[in-house]
Design a protein with these regions (language model features):
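Hydrophobic beta-strand signal
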Residues: 107, 119, 127-128, 173, ...
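Polar/charged, compositionally biased leader and regulatory segments
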Residues: 1-117, 121, 215-216
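Small beta-barrel nucleic-acid-binding modules, principally OB-folds
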Residues: 100-111, 144-145, 149-163, 208
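Short loop/turn microsegments at loop-to-beta-strand junctions
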Residues: 115-116, 129, 167-168
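Zn2+-dependent peptidoglycan hydrolase active-site motif and core
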Residues: 121-161
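Short linear motifs in intrinsically disordered
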Residues: 99, 131-136, 194-195
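Envelope-exposed proteins and targeting segments
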Residues: 104-106, 114-116, 122-125, 139-141, ...
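Conserved, short, structured surface segments that act as functional micro-motifs
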Residues: 138-146, 162-217
């Protein structure tokens, strides 16, 4: 999978969510936020709309991602080590969040106000679209993509209202194809990202899972 974007170092700072932030901002500028092997994940939201970026444990089976920025809430030991050996700073600053299952960086959360446009983090094809139902209520959907350059992986994007133009089989382009918009998840759970934003912490979630092995027989 080819890397998307250049070598710029966007400085993303938590920003308040106001009515003006709900106006369409268009696609994000090229910026990589994480990777796993040769697969790079591009920032899915316009930089001016991002409130914070966080990583936490993902759902069952989610794979560990490598953040491409500097952890903003690292401990004293980590700060000393990074001061000596350096750290990755090519991506946006991020926060380690509690909770989830599996590796502590297996879920990427990119915060923005509900209604903010979300774009594809990879080139690929839509594999499935499923509603997220909690306590009998639908809170957006989960979209699974098969990355063009990494067919053995599945990129899952959730906490979004799917764009009606997308169907199973639709091709998507990193940073150019709109997947949908962020849903208001504040009524479903207390969101960890809210600790680092000036709002309820709404966000899009991105995870990477192994693709299911084909059945033999």
């Amino acid at each position: 999978m080819s890397a998307f974007g250049g070598s710029g170092k966007p400085d993303l700072q938590p920003a308040p969510a106001s009515a003006s932030r709900l106006m369409p901002a268009g696609p994000p500028q090229p910026a990589l936020v994480a990777q796993i092997g040769t697969l790079h994940l591009r920032l899915p939201i316009a930089q001016s709309r991002v409130t914070a970026v966080g990583f936490q444990g993902g759902s069952a089976g989610a794979l560990a991602l490598s953040p491409l920025g500097t952890q903003r809430n690292q401990g004293v030991v980590q700060r000393v080590v990074h001061a000596i050996v350096g750290s990755s700073s090519s991506g946006p600053g991020w926060y380690q969040l509690p909770g989830g299952q599996g590796p502590s960086t297996s879920a990427l959360e990119v915060g923005a106000a509900a209604g903010t446009d979300v774009y594809s983090p990879v080139d690929g094809t839509v594999l499935s679209i499923e509603n997220i139902v909690l306590n009998g209520r639908i809170y957006g959907s989960r979209l699974d993509l098969q990355p063009t350059g990494a067919p053995s992986l599945i990129v899952s994007i959730s906490h979004i209202k799917i764009d009606p133009s997308l169907v199973v089989g639709s091709p998507v382009a990193a940073g150019a194809s709109k997947l949908g918009s962020i849903v208001d998840f504040s009524g479903a759970e207390k969101q960890s990202l809210a600790r680092y934003t000036n709002d309820s912490g709404n966000h899009v979630v991105i995870e990477v899972h192994p693709a299911a092995a084909p059945a033999l027989g």
